[in-house]
Amino acid sequence: MMQNNPFPYSNTEKRYHTLNYHLREHFGHKVFKVALDGGFDCPNRDGTVAHGGCTFCSAAGSGDFAGNRTDDLITQFHDIKNRMHEKWKDGKYIAYFQAFTNTHAPVEVLREKFESVLALDDVVGISIATRPDCLPDDVVDYLAELNERTYLWVELGLQTVHERTALLINRAHDFNCYVEGVNKLRKHGIRVCSHIINGLPLEDRDMMMETAKAVADLDVQGIKIHLLHLLKGTPMVKQYEKGKLEFLSQDDYVQLVCDQLEIIPPEMIVHRITGDGPIELMIGPMWSVNKWEVLGAINKELENRGSYQGKFFQRLEEESAL
C-alpha cells in the first residue's frame, strides 16, 4: 500500500486492483500480454448460433490490436515481443488469444495452437478470450488441464446483463448461459475475467450499474470495463444513424466507472477500465483516444471522493443479513 492511498491492493497511486499489480505480486516481475490472432471464427458470425456477430464487433473480431492474422502464431508473438522489448528490456509474457472466439474449434486444434506458444521462452501463461456458449465439456476439460500446469485466464464477454440490450446488439446468448459458463470454469478453479461495456445503445447509468453489480456477485476473479467505441463498418453504425446510440461524455464515463469500481470486490482484478479503437476506424467518442488522460481522471476522481475499489461492496450473504 502506498502512503495516502487506503487501497490495499496497490503500491502506486492507483485506487483499484490493476492487472499489473497482480502480475507483479504473482510472478515477482513485470509481465506483458501479447495479443494474438489464432485464426478462429465466431459462432455468432458463421451460423453456428447466429449470423452477423455482435453489432459493435469489428471485422477483426475485437482483435484490432492483435497480431497479423496472415502470420503464424510464432511470427505474431515474436513481432510483438520485439516491439515491446525496444521499450521494456526485461519481463515475461502471457500469450493472449484475443481475436474472435478462441475455443471455437475441436480440442486437438486448440491444443496445437495453445501449446505452440506456451513452449516459447519467457511465456509464463495464457489468456483465452471466448464466449460462454463455446465451452463444451471436452474443451473445459482441456482448459482444466492447462490450468494445472500454467497460469491461465479465460475471458468471457458478458457486455450487459440486460436481455433487451443483448438482443439489440445481437449477442446471441442470454445471462443464464453466461452464469453456466462461469460455473463450468470455476468448477475447475480456472480464473475468469468478465468483459462489460459502458455506453451500449439505450442503456442508462442505472442499467450499467446493474451489470457491474451482477459481475460483482458472480464467482469471477477479474473484470474488463470497456467504453463502447463505434467503429466504421460495424453493424452498430446503422443503430447510431437511427438515433439509438448516444456517446457518453468523458466526465459521465469517469463518474460511472468510479461508481462501478466502488461496488465490486476489492480483490477482483481490474484488467481494463477504458478502451479505444484504431484511430482510422473511430467514429466516436473521440475523447477516448486520450487513454492516459481518462485513466488519470478516474484515479483523480477516486482520490477526490476519498474512495477506492470495493468501498461499497457487499457480499450476497451480507446483503441477505440486512
From Swiss-Prot:
Keywords assigned by UniProt, alphabetized: 4Fe-4S, Iron, Iron-sulfur, Metal-binding, S-adenosyl-L-methionine
Domain Radical SAM core: 26-267
Residues that span the membrane, as ranges: none
Gene Ontology MF: a single term: metal ion binding
Binding sites annotated in the UniProt record for [4Fe-4S] cluster: C42, C54, C57
Cofactors that this protein relies on: [4Fe-4S] cluster
Family: Belongs to the radical SAM superfamily.
PANTHER family reported in the protein's UniProt record: HISTONE ACETYLTRANSFERASE-RELATED, PROTEIN YHCC
Name this protein carries in UniProt: Uncharacterized protein YtqA
Gene name of this polypeptide: ytqA
